[in-house]
Amino acid sequence: MLTVNTATAPADLGPGWRSGIDKRPSSEALSVRAPGPRQGGLGSGVVGDSICDPRHHGGDDQAVYAYAREDLDDWQSRLDREITNGVFGENITTSDVDVTNCLVGERWSIGSDGLMLEATSPRTPCKTFSTWLGIPGWIKTFTAGGVPGAYFRVITPGTMRAGDRIEVVDRPDHSVTIGMVFRALMLEPE
C-alpha cells in the first residue's frame, strides 16, 4: 500500500455543497472499522475520514475505497496533469495490486494486526467527482476508461498505514470482477 488517504476537512464545491472527496495521504496508522448503515452510521470505515453525502457514500458496503497507483499513472498520462494519491477520493492507494480485476467477495489482509477487507462493488462516477477534478466530460471519460477502483467492507477491524502489505487471502469460486460489474452497470446494462 502506497498511501492511506483521508479527508479531514470537507471540500467546499459550491454554495451548500460540501464533499469528503479531498483526501490526502496520512503518515499515521489509522483505525478501520465497520461504519454501520449509510444513514445514521459513522460514514467512512476509516476513522477520521469525512463522508458528507451519506445518501450516496459510506456505510458498511462502501467503508473503504481503493484505487491502484498504476491506474492513476495512466490517467496522469492521458490527462497530461499531475494526479496525486488520494485525489480520486480513495482511502487506499495501492501498488502492484490489480484493484479493477479483484473479484467481488475477494478478501484482503492489510498490515499485521488482522485488518481484513472484502471487495463489494466498483465506484460509479458522480457530479461531485467531476466537479472536484474540473474536467469537462469527466463522468463519460472515467466510465470509458473502465478502471473504477473498488469499495470494500470491513470484515475484521484493525489499523493500516502507508507501506503496509496487502495480501489477497481469499478469492471466491466465481469470475465476477469489480471491472465486470462496472461494465455491466455503466457500459453494457443489458
Residues covered by each model-derived region:
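Loop/turn positions that initiate beta-strands
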Residues: 105, 157, 161-164
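A structural signal for small-residue-enriched, beta-sheet-centric alpha/beta enzyme cores
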Residues: 147-148, 164-166
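Glycine-rich active-site loops that engage anionic ligands at enzyme catalytic sites
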Residues: 106-156
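Electropositive, beta-rich accessory/interaction domains or terminal extensions
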Residues: 1-111, 115-128, 170-190
